[in-house]
């Protein structure tokens, strides 16, 4: 606090002692009073004094006010008074009408109090927590106070909010507040928060800020809205400008499409309010932020395409050609359209097709050029039209060809009813207005930029100077105007046009040198010692002469490279020439023009350099300097290298064209494949639908069939009793035949099983007898597992056969029972003479038994069917066992061969071991004879190892 008193010592005589004492007493009440009402009244009194006695209240009461915010959060009224008091202390808004000499002091005072407040970061965190309160009297003063802190000391407050947990998210909730004043002040708060802080900008953008802000703009009426729309647009600019991540997020979120509604300006609009002009101006600037030339090329291109696809470019062109548009809006619209079409072929083609609503219709380019060469139009508008024309021709060879074609004799309209772009450019080039000369020269230079074909085509242009005189070429007319000594702006424009025209075009250089007056004029301009105003012209003349040397193909004997360099050395001097050449890049307006493509000048006098021309100077200044100092031999070598490079470039171009054609073919084939895939998918879906329909029809058919069978069964139930004696014996006989077949098949299966058992036993015996103990030791566990599996399969087959035999026996018994029942039924048929009642009773009994027999017959049929299926399965298992036995036989043969080989190898090893032992014994005896001690333990150890190996082998044999 003493620091503030020292800094603001000039105000020490400020209030009377009674006021200072009052403030001190109020602070004491806030600090020491136990009653909430007393503290509340004291804070309210401090609030009323804080505007007039800002310094004293700030020095004495700030700590107490912060303490109130910490301890009295339950009382919204005292919190509101405390926040308002802090706002009055920190904010400079109330000092706007104060005299200028005290304004700076008040600003310093606000920043110093802000520094004291944020010295403890917990104070900002406390303020963020208060913003979560929904109470209007707490939330709104908190928003105002935090906004004031950000305005006073933005970066440190931003850093505190950034590291605070959910700090930015809490502030984003303000945009969803239903109370407009809080929402609107929340927008202002976010403006201050996002200024020059990329990290916070990203967080705010990913907190759905774009969606909320665009909704607010739509609710407020787009461009017809009030100052809230302006604030939202400024916040959107903060989020998007120089922030590639947010720009990509804005494009990917399809928010560009929502911008189209902003520019739907109807002709029925009675007038343009100042707020509407401001809003539309900011909207156009926001579009330019997305397509700025300083953005990454990929991001700019994608935004340009999105703007064309959603109709935003079309809407901007509608405003461009509309009537009654304010001049500043029209100028900004031209600049916006310029950057939307810059370098985008699709957008440039669309812009070329736009016509002005005139009779007859004229292309928009022609109408704009008419404004550019008209000296009565505003300077800013003419600059905007030039920028639009430059952007239309940027990387647009098609557009360049169309503009140059309007200058050629074959395309000029003989009737003179329509004015072409070429005629307007020529008219501006040779006008008496120096600004028109400069603009037309720069525009024509952009029609030639990087396009050697159009440079050659422009050499064909002939101009009729006066009646009776022969036509003069455009190139010659430009040099004639240069030699006449016109204004500096005109000469600079023509020299820039000639430098652009002659660079990278040896044919144009030859045409230029063919006029014998051009070289002496250039050398004379360079050699003279003129004032500072003419130094720029001298530098441009030096550049033009250097281009004539560097791109010279030596087709003219009098003006070869070597002769021109000798001429420079004689007339000018190499050092003097290089010094004059450096005048261009040292000019103060050169660096300004090289920064941005847009020709943005405060007045016509500053309109000297073009952005693209500065690039050309950077490219050629160094190579021209080297070319001046090169010898003829080095020039020859360089020409050979150039020819080789040209040949290489031609080959590369040829292959590029081939690759391009192949790419087109691939694209066509891919499209065909995609169409065929679509057709295939459609056919597959159709087939699936048809299959489902067929299945439905089948199900319906089966259902109808079952229903029909039930009906037939009910109809034939009355006649079944009469056919018992005829049908039942047939069924029984058929069952007997099936049982006999099952018996015979069972016998056959048992015989086959017996044969398989004998085969397996033979294999086992042969395997046991044929394999030695070593073979058994080397036999893989996999073979043993296969044998075990075969045994299990055989046992399973046997058990299945036993179960089948039991089933057959059961069926035989059931068959005999059926026969007995049939005989009893035959005996129980009624005899003549019995009473009708007895006959009816017996008939009923017979019908019941008959239905039971029929049911049992069906069950027998099902069982027989199951037995037949089991028989088939057993047959398959037998076949698989046969194949397994064959495989085992082959494996046994292989094992037998391996055992034989291993026996031979073991015999050989035994022989080798015996020889080795003999050698070892002889060596040991020799060592003993020589007197060396020999340990006998090794032999015993070896012998023990051998014994262990033999024991292990015996165990393996036992296994």
Swiss-Prot record:
GO terms for cellular component: cytosol; endoplasmic reticulum; ER to Golgi transport vesicle membrane; Golgi membrane; Golgi stack; perinuclear region of cytoplasm. The modification N6-acetyllysine is found at residue 202. It is found in: Cytoplasm, Cytosol; Golgi apparatus membrane. Residues 638-930 form a coiled coil. Composed of a globular head, an elongated tail (coiled-coil) and a highly acidic C-terminal domain. PANTHER family: GENERAL VESICULAR TRANSPORT FACTOR P115 (PTHR10013:SF0). Homodimer. Dimerizes by parallel association of the tails, resulting in an elongated structure with two globular head domains side by side, and a long rod-like tail structure. Interacts with MIF. Interacts with GM130/GOLGA2; interaction is disrupted upon phosphorylation of GM130/GOLGA2 by CDK1 at the onset of mitosis. This is General vesicular transport factor p115.
């Amino acid at each position: 606090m003493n620091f503030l008193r020292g800094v603001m010592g000039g105000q020490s005589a400020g209030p009377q002692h009674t006021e200072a004492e009052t403030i001190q007493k109020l602070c004491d009440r806030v600090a020491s009073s136990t009653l909430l009402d007393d503290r509340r009244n004291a804070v309210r009194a401090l609030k009323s004094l804080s505007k007039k006695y800002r310094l004293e209240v700030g020095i004495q009461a700030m700590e107490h006010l912060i303490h109130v915010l910490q301890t009295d959060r339950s009382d919204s009224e005292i919190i509101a008074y405390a926040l308002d008091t802090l706002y009055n202390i920190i904010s400079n808004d109330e000092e706007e009408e104060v005299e200028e000499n005290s304004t700076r002091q008040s600003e310093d005072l606000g920043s110093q109090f802000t520094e004291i407040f944020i010295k403890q970061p917990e104070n900002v965190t406390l303020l963020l927590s208060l913003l979560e309160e929904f109470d209007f009297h707490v939330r709104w003063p908190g928003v105002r106070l935090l906004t004031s802190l950000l305005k006073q000391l933005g970066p440190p407050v931003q850093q505190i909010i950034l590291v605070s947990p959910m700090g930015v998210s809490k502030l984003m909730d303000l945009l969803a507040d239903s109370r407009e004043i809080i929402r609107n002040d929340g927008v202002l708060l976010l403006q201050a928060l996002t200024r020059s802080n990329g990290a916070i900008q990203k967080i705010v953008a990913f907190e759905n800020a774009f969606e909320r802000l665009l909704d607010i703009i739509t609710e407020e009426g787009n461009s017809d809205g009030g100052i809230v729309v302006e604030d939202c647009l400024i916040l959107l600019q903060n989020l998007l400008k120089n922030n590639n991540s947010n720009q990509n997020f804005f494009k990917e979120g399809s928010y560009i499409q929502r911008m189209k509604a902003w520019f739907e300006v109807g002709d029925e609009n009675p007038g343009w309010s100042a707020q509407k002009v401001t809003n539309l101006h900011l909207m156009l600037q926001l579009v330019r932020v997305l397509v700025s030339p300083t953005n990454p090329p990929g991001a700019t291109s994608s935004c340009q395409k999105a703007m064309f696809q959603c109709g935003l470019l079309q809407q901007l062109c509608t405003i461009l050609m509309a009537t009654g548009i304010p001049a500043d809006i029209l100028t900004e619209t031209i600049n916006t359209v310029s950057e939307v079409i810059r370098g985008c072929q699709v957008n440039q083609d669309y812009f070329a097709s736009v016509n002005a609503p005139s009779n007859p219709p004229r292309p928009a380019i022609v109408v704009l050029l008419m404004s550019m060469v008209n000296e009565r139009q505003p300077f800013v508008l003419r600059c905007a039209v030039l920028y639009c024309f430059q952007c239309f021709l940027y990387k647009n060879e098609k557009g360049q060809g169309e503009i140059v074609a309007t200058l050629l004799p074959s395309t000029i309209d003989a009737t003179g009813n329509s004015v072409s772009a070429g005629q307007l450019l020529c008219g501006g080039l040779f006008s008496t207005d120096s600004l028109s000369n400069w603009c037309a020269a720069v525009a024509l230079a952009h029609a030639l930029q990087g396009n050697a074909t159009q440079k050659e085509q422009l050499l064909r242009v002939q101009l009729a100077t006066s009646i009776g005189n022969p036509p003069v070429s455009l190139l010659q007319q430009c040099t004639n105007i240069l030699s006449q000594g016109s204004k500096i702006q005109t000469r600079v424009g023509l020299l820039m046009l000639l430098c652009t025209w002659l660079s990278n075009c040896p044919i144009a250089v030859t045409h230029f040198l063919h006029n014998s007056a051009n070289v002496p004029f250039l050398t004379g301009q360079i050699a003279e010692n003129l004032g500072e105003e003419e130094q720029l012209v001298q530098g441009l003349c030096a550049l033009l002469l250097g281009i004539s040397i560097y791109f010279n193909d030596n087709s003219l004997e009098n003006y070869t490279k070597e002769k021109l360099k000798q001429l420079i050395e004689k007339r000018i001097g190499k050092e003097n020439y290089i010094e004059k050449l450096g005048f261009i890049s040292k000019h103060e307006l050169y660096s300004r023009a090289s920064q941005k493509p847009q020709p943005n000048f405060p007045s016509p006098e500053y309109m000297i350099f073009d952005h693209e021309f500065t690039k050309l100077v950077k490219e050629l200044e160094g190579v021209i300097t080297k070319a001046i100092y090169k010898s003829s031999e080095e020039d020859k070598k360089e020409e050979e290298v150039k020819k080789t490079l040209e040949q290489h470039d031609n080959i590369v171009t040829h292959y590029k064209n081939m690759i391009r054609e192949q790419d087109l073919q691939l694209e066509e084939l891919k499209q065909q494949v995609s169409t065929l895939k679509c057709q295939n998918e459609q056919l597959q879906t159709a087939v699936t639908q048809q299959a489902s329909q067929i299945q439905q029809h089948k199900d319906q058919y089966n259902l109808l069939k079952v229903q029909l069978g039930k009906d037939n069964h009910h109809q034939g139930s009355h006649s079944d009793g009469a056919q018992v004696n005829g049908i039942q014996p047939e069924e029984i006989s058929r069952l007997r035949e099936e049982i006999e077949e099952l018996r015979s098949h069972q016998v056959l299966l048992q015989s086959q099983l017996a044969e398989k058992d004998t085969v397996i036993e033979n294999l086992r015996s042969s395997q046991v007898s044929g394999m030695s103990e070593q073979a058994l030791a080397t036999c893989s566990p996999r073979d043993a597992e296969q044998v075990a599996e075969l045994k299990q399969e055989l046992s399973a087959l046997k058990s299945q056969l036993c179960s089948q035999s039991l089933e057959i026996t059961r069926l035989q018994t059931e068959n005999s029972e059926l026969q007995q029942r049939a005989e009893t039924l035959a005996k129980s048929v009624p005899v003549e003479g019995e009473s009708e009642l007895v006959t009816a009773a017996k008939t009923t009994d017979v019908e019941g038994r008959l239905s039971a027999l029929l049911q049992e017959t069906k069950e027998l049929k099902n069982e027989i069917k199951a037995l037949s299926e089991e028989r088939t399965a057993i047959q398959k298992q037998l076949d698989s066992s046969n194949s397994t036995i064959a495989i085992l036989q082959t494996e046994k043969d292989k094992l037998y061969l391996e055992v034989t080989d291993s026996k031979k190898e073991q015999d050989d090893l035994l022989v080798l071991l015996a020889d080795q032992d003999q050698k070892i014994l002889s060596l040991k005896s020799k060592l003993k004879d020589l007197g060396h001690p020999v340990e006998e333990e090794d032999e015993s150890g070896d012998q023990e190892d051998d014994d262990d190996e033999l024991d292990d082998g015996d165990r393996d044999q036992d296994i």
